[in-house]
From Swiss-Prot:
Keywords: Amino-acid biosynthesis, Aminotransferase, Cytoplasm, Pyridoxal phosphate, Pyridoxine biosynthesis, Serine biosynthesis, Transferase. Homodimer. It catalyses: O-phospho-L-serine + 2-oxoglutarate = 3-phosphooxypyruvate + L-glutamate; 4-(phosphooxy)-L-threonine + 2-oxoglutarate = (R)-3-hydroxy-2-oxo-4-phosphooxybutanoate + L-glutamate. It is an enzyme of class 2 (transferase). This is Phosphoserine aminotransferase. Catalyzes the reversible conversion of 3-phosphohydroxypyruvate to phosphoserine and of 3-hydroxy-2-oxo-4-phosphonooxybutanoate to phosphohydroxythreonine. The gene is serC. Pyridoxal 5'-phosphate binds at residues 108, 158, 182, 205, 247-248. It comes from the Bacteria. Signal peptide: none annotated. Pathway: Amino-acid biosynthesis; L-serine biosynthesis; L-serine from 3-phospho-D-glycerate: step 2/3; Cofactor biosynthesis; pyridoxine 5'-phosphate biosynthesis; pyridoxine 5'-phosphate from D-erythrose 4-phosphate: step 3/5. Pfam families: Aminotran_5 (PF00266). The modification N6-(pyridoxal phosphate)lysine is found at residue 206.
Length: 370
């Protein structure tokens, strides 16, 4: 079966091997007589699925033993509240809410600081809003505050298509705050330098699996500082102490994510995926930059390898472009409503053949309209 190529920003395309495997196991997982979605989360069958997914993810992302891996719910948007509920009091007296620094580089980090203001004092350490979120403020320019509990960045902005290709070293900047990284839209697309990270979180629905699962990787010394008002199910220490089963976890989403982890291992792991992703992004950006019809607004040194926004110089052609793309089996290319234009999300599951098909269509559409 030749499926269309899905460029959705999330929920996003899944590896076809994973979908085929899940379909085969839908009614009877490994002779258990049950679908995974019917299993008790405390039964031995699902516990084995959870434990394998946990082990595979730690191996794939090279997560040190000093970090806890949590499988939670609520997505990245919920983590914008859960993080300050857990970390803002870390360096404050008597468990009072403290402060946090935010680097605002696009729509998602903007939402993050807006949500955090409900629970702690927020300092905007840097922002690229004045240039339309098309560049990234270098860490040396950040105005970090003294005594902040953490510094929050979105390392890849899904909407605006900017990416920090290297995580900042807060210690080198003279800050003792923990670095919090929203890596929802490029987790598992490249290695992570955990020596620079205090906490990383990611909604699974872009690069790890289906919607419903949220990954949190948190350094152990950051546990146990939650505000008194933090709900028990969102208290990282409570979740960690109960192996992510304090409340019923998103069992089927964990199962599918586990299949994705195994697929990633078969592809050669994260380093292999990074090389593949760099090649895909280079192919697409080259086609856009060397065209007469399309353009990308983001500075080349901070372009996202996962989310590629682009625009037609003649916007009256937008509808025709999208209709033609669908006819060519290229789906979900419409840009975010706040930005307009087009966007191609080329996550791990997008094969090089899919990007090449898009590039071929870009050339064909331009030729017909010239």
């Amino acid at each position: 079966m030749n499926r269309p190529y899905n460029f959705s920003a999330g929920p996003a395309a899944m590896p076809q091997e994973v979908l085929t495997e899940a379909a085969a196991e839908m009614l009877d997982w490994h002779g258990s007589g049950m679908s995974v979605m019917e299993m008790s989360h405390r039964g031995r069958e699902f516990v084995s699925i959870y434990e394998q997914a946990h082990l595979d993810l730690r191996e794939l992302l090279a997560v040190p033993d000093s970090f806890k891996i949590l499988f939670m719910q609520g997505g990245g948007l919920a983590e914008n509240a859960i993080v300050p509920l857990n970390l803002s009091a870390r360096v404050s007296p008597a468990g009072a809410a403290g402060s946090a620094d935010f680097v605002v580089t696009g729509g998602w980090s903007l939402k993050s600081q807006q949500e955090a203001r409900k629970y702690c004092t927020v300092n905007i350490a840097a922002s690229n809003e004045s240039d339309g979120h098309t560049t990234l403020p270098g860490p040396a320019s950040w105005q970090l505050s003294h005594g902040a509990s953490y510094v929050h960045i979105c390392s890849n902005e899904t909407i605006h298509g900017v990416e920090y290709h290297t995580l900042p070293d807060l210690q080198a900047l003279g800050s003792e705050a923990a670095l919090v990284v929203d890596c929802s839209s490029h987790v598992a697309s490249r290695p992570i330098d955990w020596s620079r990270v205090g906490l990383a979180f990611a909604g699974a629905q872009k690069n790890l699996g289906p919607a419903g699962l949220t990954l949190v990787v948190v350094r152990e010394d950051l546990l146990g500082h939650a505000l008194a008002v933090c709900p028990s199910a969102f208290n990282y220490k409570t979740v960690a102490d109960n192996q992510s089963m304090f409340n019923t976890p998103p069992t089927y989403a964990i199962y599918i994510a586990g299949l994705v982890f195994q697929w990633l291992k078969r592809q050669g792991g994260i380093a292999a995926m990074e090389a593949r992703n760099q090649a895909k992004a280079a192919l697409l950006y080259d086609a856009i930059d060397n065209s007469q019809l399309y353009y990308n607004k983001v500075a080349p040194n901070c372009r996202s390898r996962m989310n590629v926004p682009f625009f037609l110089r003649d916007e009256s052609l937008n509808d025709a472009f999208l209709a033609g793309a669908r006819e060519h089996g290229l789906l979900q290319l419409k840009g975010h409503k706040s930005v307009g234009g087009m966007r191609a999300s080329i996550y791990n599951a997008m094969p090089m053949e899919g990007v090449q098909a898009l590039v071929n269509y870009l050339h064909e559409f331009q030729k017909r309209r010239s």
